[in-house]
Amino acid sequence: NNMDKIICSNIWKIFGNDEKRILDNLDPNLSRDEVQEKTGHVVAVKDVSFSIQKGETFVVMGLSGSGKSTLVRCLTRLIEPTSGSVIIDDTDITKISRNSLLDLRRNKMSMVFQHFGLFPHRTVLENISYGLEIRGEKKQDRLDKATESLNLVGLKGWHNNYPRELSGGMQQRVGLARAMAVEPEILIFDEPFSALDPLIRREMQDELLDIQKKLQRTMVFITHDFLEAIKMGDHIAIMKDGEISQVG
């Protein structure tokens, strides 16, 4: 289907020092705990397949330890899958070189984590333009894009402030603006709002839904919160013990 932006096929991730061999000899009847007991290896992601259409928000929901954060890091190869393929725009990224991968991360995808990872000694605007700087864009272009991004997330007037002067919710807006500034085709969110208090969390959800209406990016959104999943997702994959039990 030419609408598919991301196709994951049979993704496995096993943690341990001999992951390939363990996978090749895996007894399918053993539970995760039994595998760990017998082999000292942890099956974090178990034979997961799904596809994500261009412009949709695909939510992966599960409790902590379900493998959802590991899975999403396999999409960018921050964690190398033990086996399986991740096809983004017809390219299997598990097969590309380190340089192509960095290029892809720089130009095509952005990640937003729960911990904002802002630079304390940079202003809000400088934080937002960081990705553009790495990419080597001209200063004026950087400022223009960063300012646009800043306004998009409702931080107009805060560009010269420093992260410590902002509340948690506002810091998360800066993180969101930074991800948006590079105009990525794919945005990956790992529990971005779960550290915020409920009211601000709802505000941020609404904000992201508005932004998504305007920009129609492809989004992968991880959460443990059922209500958040329903609110944010076009499709929801439920993950448990490293497997996706259903996609709705």
What residues fall within each predicted segment?
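ABC ATPase "signature
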Residues: 247-248
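Conserved ABC transporter NBD signature motif
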Residues: 84-92
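Helix-to-loop junction immediately C-terminal to a conserved catalytic motif
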Residues: 76
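Conserved ABC ATPase "signature" region
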Residues: 24-34, 91-92, 129, 133-136, ...
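Conserved ABC ATPase signature
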Residues: 162-166, 170
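A short, proline-enriched helix->beta-strand linker immediately N-terminal to the Walker B motif
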Residues: 181-185
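ABC ATPase NBD coupling module
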Residues: 35-40, 94-110, 134, 139-140
